[in-house]
Structure formats: structure tokens, C-alpha cells
Amino acid sequence: VRPMPTISETNYDQFDFCEDVHKLMCRRVKKTLTTKGLFYRTKEMEDKYPNIEFISKVKEELSEVKHRIMLYDLCYLYSMDKGDNIEMRSMLKAMYSDHMDAAHEQKALRLGDHPLLDHKLVTIEGDEKLKVDDRMLQLLYGDAAEAFLTIVKKLDRYSFVAEINKAFYNPRDFSMRGNPFAKMHEA
């Protein structure tokens, strides 16, 4: 059996970095790493890879390591097709051993007073889900981000009406669904 080849540091990129931060969070969950240890090791890794543009841009955006860790983990989960609606509570429980620290962070997110929201890196779906925003995708993917960004189609007046019709009309039973103008339609 031959040993696995080592990956050269020149191939190490933002995706590898985010995966490594995620692994640290998994260790925190298993209680083999403290929250302070998670923060310290993440800073140490950031300092080890100053040449990765993604890391330096994230550090410019977010001054506190706890917010950067959240972003790195969201990036990892998104890039691994785990979805872009991540449960806020699960992520915070993975980061913090102290429930009150997690509760304060959750409160800030829910009240809209959080750096990830201020910098338009995430949005909140419902009360509990963190959704990756286009700005975060641009940080993570750089020039290739267009493949993942929400595309806003330019519609002429006819295609606009067709899109509205698709959103509200149910062709199966010829009824209107969720239409705020349904009462006007019946009249």
C-alpha cells in the first residue's frame, strides 16, 4: 500500500480552507476542541495562507473571527451542495460551547443587527435559516460567481405578464393560487 500523495500548498484554495474550518467545527462539536481553540486555530490558519485572496477579503469585511468562521462554514456547506438554507441554531451550537454566547449571536441575527447581514453576505429565511447571498458567492467564487448568482431576467411587458400568470395560475384546476387579486378576478 502506497501512502497518499500530499497536496502541495500551491493547490490549497479557499474551498480547502473552508473545509478545514468546517473540520475544526466538527471537532468542537465532538468536544475535542473548545470554542476558544476553534477561534485560535482559525486565526492561525488565516495567517498561514495570506496569499489566498478570499481569506484577505473576508478579513477586510469581517473584523471578528467568530463571524468569519460562520462565513467559512456557510461557504463550505454551500460548496458541498448541502444547500444554501442552513439552520442558524445548528451552526451556532457547533461553534459555541456556551449556550448564552450562541443565544446572543442568534439574537443579533434575528434582529438584523449582525455583520453577516450588514455586509449583505447572508439573508435570513423564516426565523431559522441562513441563506447564502450573491455577495458571499462573489467573494467565494470570484469571476466564476456568475454561474451561481441569482439571475434577474429583463422582461418586456408580455413576458412580465406571462411570469405573473405562472406564479399565480394553477393550470391543473384552472384556479388562482395565492393571488392577492383573486377577489377582483371572481367579480
Language-model segments: residues:
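Intrinsically disordered, low-complexity N-terminal extensions of AAA+/P-loop NTPases
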Residues: V1-A187
